[in-house]
A protein has these predicted regions:
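Beta-strand-loop-alpha-helix segment that lines the small-molecule cofactor/substrate pocket
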Residues: 113-114, 118-166, 180
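Alpha-helix C-terminal capping/helix-to-coil transition sites in glycosyltransferase folds
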Residues: 102-104
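Conserved SAM-binding strand-loop segment of SAM-dependent methyltransferases
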Residues: 90-95
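N-terminal Rossmann-like NAD(P) cofactor-binding module of classical short-chain dehydrogenase/reductase
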Residues: 108-109
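Predominantly a Rossmann-like dinucleotide-binding segment in NAD(P)-dependent oxidoreductases
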Residues: 49, 53, 154-159, 164-238
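Pocket-flanking alpha-helical
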Residues: 55-57, 78-80, 97-98, 118-123, ...
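N-terminal Rossmann-like dinucleotide-binding module
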Residues: 15-86, 167
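N-terminal secretory signal peptides and thylakoid transit peptides that target proteins
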Residues: 2-19
Length: 238
């Protein structure tokens, strides 16, 4: 039986508190019931950045919300994402600010490269919308303080995409450890992955479908290198 007391706002609060690698992994039964509710009661979501992690989230969002607007500086990503995850019905924007200003959006996913996270999240909250922001939410301590201040000023919800920590399996493992069901903890092992290695890469002109200047945003401008763009941006430093 569908719970008539579940509103879009309540769904958004639940939605902001649960997230796995594909978001859907830890939906509650109440949230799952949203799939059977009227389309008018489903949250309307905008997605900024339409690369790999946004695709993962889109699969999890399907039973919970409707993707109604998308933005990306790569036209190819924009069109593919719309066709695959929004049935070609989402509004498309090349500038994220236009998506933020679009009416009828309840929450916005920020799935861009790291250096854009804080700027976009702040703009979204100041526009009166809630945010799901991929990790890392910030790159510096000062950015974190600024983000916290804006959250308090606006009263908006900001959920950071620490999907593993939110998953039921991970939370069960933590509970087992805390209760000593696994025995006394004697050692903690932490592994930090490393990126790929390679020689110096050649620069080239950016493809016509990519706004390279906007991709770089507020970072120092550098020549385009195909191997350092999109999903590979974290592995290389000057």
């Amino acid at each position: 039986m569908i719970n008539p007391k579940i509103t879009r706002r309540k769904t958004l609060k639940t939605f902001s508190g649960v997230a796995t690698g594909s978001v859907a992994g830890c939906f509650t039964s109440a949230v799952q019931s949203e799939e059977r509710r009227s389309p008018n009661d489903r949250p309307r979501v905008g997605v900024v950045g339409n690369g790999g992690i946004a695709r993962s989230h889109a699969r999890g969002l399907k039973p919970l919300a409707d993707i109604v607007a998308i933005a990306d500086v790569d036209r190819q990503h924009l069109e593919q994402y719309n066709a695959e995850y929004a049935a070609g019905k989402a509004q498309q924007f090349s500038a994220y600010r236009d998506l933020i200003d679009a009416p009828g959006i309840d929450a916005i996913f920020v799935c861009t490269p790291d250096h854009w996270h804080v700027k976009i999240a702040i703009d979204v909250m100041r526009a009166g919308k809630d945010v799901y922001c991929e990790k890392p939410a910030t790159l510096t301590i000062d950015e974190g303080r600024t983000l916290c201040r804006v959250i308090k000023e606006t009263g908006r919800v900001l959920q950071v995409g620490t999907q593993q920590r939110s998953s039921p399996k991970f939370q069960t493992a933590v509970a087992l450890a805390h209760s000593q069901r696994l025995g006394k903890m004697k050692r903690v092992t932490v592994a930090i992955g490393s990126g790929p290695k390679g020689p110096a890469f050649d620069t080239s002109s950016p493809p016509s479908n990519l706004n390279w200047n906007m991709w770089q945003g507020q970072t120092p401008s550098v020549d385009y290198i195909a191997q350092r763009c999109h999903g590979n941006f974290r592995w290389w430093y000057e």
